[in-house]
Curated annotation (Swiss-Prot):
It comes from Bacillus licheniformis (strain ATCC 14580 / DSM 13 / JCM 2505 / CCUG 7422 / NBRC 12200 / NCIMB 9375 / NCTC 10341 / NRRL NRS-1264 / Gibson 46). Na(+) binds at residues 71, 74. It is a multi-pass membrane protein. Na(+) is not transported, but it plays an essential structural role and its presence is essential for fluoride channel function. The lineage of its organism: Bacteria, Bacillati, Bacillota, Bacilli, Bacillales. The gene is fluC2. This is Fluoride-specific ion channel FluC 2.
Length: 132
């Protein structure tokens, strides 16, 4: 039951933050709020993944922040809908949005994992393991 509560709390906070970012509004041409939510959410999930990689497992914290907060904050459904609408109305913008979102999402997640490992000390432990 604690797991459900952790995901619920994180998801509620993440969804509220996503709503706040959406209030900033996007342009009629490019859906900046969703782009910002998904790329920053990828960075945050990467940070959490890297940070908890070498730390004692804290499943409730991980569920609250990873599954709950990041899951509530990021939005695959809005990304998909916006991509389809852009492809139908302005194909070149739709392709740009699709490629930029995927490339930035993956790069930010990778960067987050690297930074998270460095902050937690996991990077040094991995280096020692390979040098032994």
């Amino acid at each position: 039951m604690k797991s459900y509560v952790a995901v619920f709390i994180g998801g509620a906070i993440g969804s509220l933050l996503r709503y706040a970012v959406n209030l900033l509004g996007g342009t009629a041409v490019f859906p900046w709020p969703t782009f910002i939510e998904n790329t920053s959410g990828s960075l945050l999930l990467g940070l959490l993944t890297g940070f908890f990689a070498a730390r004692a497992k804290k499943p409730l914290v991980q569920l609250c922040l990873g599954t709950g907060f990041c899951g509530g904050y990021t939005t695959m459904s809005a990304f998909s809908k916006e991509t389809v609408l852009l492809l139908q109305s302005a194909a070149h913008i739709g392709v740009l949005y699709l490629m930029a979102s995927l490339a930035c999402g993956v790069c930010f997640a990778f960067l987050g994992i690297v930074i998270g490992k460095k902050v937690s000390g996991a990077a040094g432990k991995e280096k020692e393991r390979y040098q032994s």
